[in-house]
C-alpha cells in the first residue's frame, strides 16, 4: 500500500509499505478521510517533536512514521479479543497512546 512517511525535517516520502494486519486487541480501519493538522505541519518543518526516533514503549513505532492522525473510516478487520467494534462499523480515531492500565 502507499503511505506518506516522515523521515526528517522537510523530508516526507510517498512509499510502498506492507499493509498492516489487525493484531491482538487492535482493529484495522480503511481510511475514508484524513486531515493534516498543525502538529503534522510542525513535524514537517521542525520535527521530531512527537514522532518517536527510538522505539516507542507503548506503540513499538519509530521513525520513519506514517503521517496523518486525524482520520475516520470503517473497520475491515478485528484482532483477537476485540469486542466493542465489528467489521463494517464506522469509526473515528483518537490518536492517544495509553497504557490501558491507569
Q: What role is predicted for each listed range?
A:
Residues 42-50:
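Short Gly/aromatic-enriched secondary-structure transition segments
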Residues 11-17:
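Short glycine/threonine/proline-enriched tight-turn/helix- or strand-capping micro-motif at secondary-structure
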Residues 1-4:
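Short structural boundary motif marking the start of a folded domain
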Residues 20-34, 49-101:
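Glycine-rich beta-strand-centered segment in the early N-terminal region that forms part
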Residues 6, 44, 76-79:
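Short beta-strand-to-turn element immediately C-terminal to the catalytic PLP-Schiff-base lysine
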Residues 38:
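Helix-loop element at the rim of GNAT/NAT acetyltransferase active sites that forms part
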Residues 7, 42, 69:
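Histidine-centered active-site/metal-ligand motif
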Amino acid at each position: 500500500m502507499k503511505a506518506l512517511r516522515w523521515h526528517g525535517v522537510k523530508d516526507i516520502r510517498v512509499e510502498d509499505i506492507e499493509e498492516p494486519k489487525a493484531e491482538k486487541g487492535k482493529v484495522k480501519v480503511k481510511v475514508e478521510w484524513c486531515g493534516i493538522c498543525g502538529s503534522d505541519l510542525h513535524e514537517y518543518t521542525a520535527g521530531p517533536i512527537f514522532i518517536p526516533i527510538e522505539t516507542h514503549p507503548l506503540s513499538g513505532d519509530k521513525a520513519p512514521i506514517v503521517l496523518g492522525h486525524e482520520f475516520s473510516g470503517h473497520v475491515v478487520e478485528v484482532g483477537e479479543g476485540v469486542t466493542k467494534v465489528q467489521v463494517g462499523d464506522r469509526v473515528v480515531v483518537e490518536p492517544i497512546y495509553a497504557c490501558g492500565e491507569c
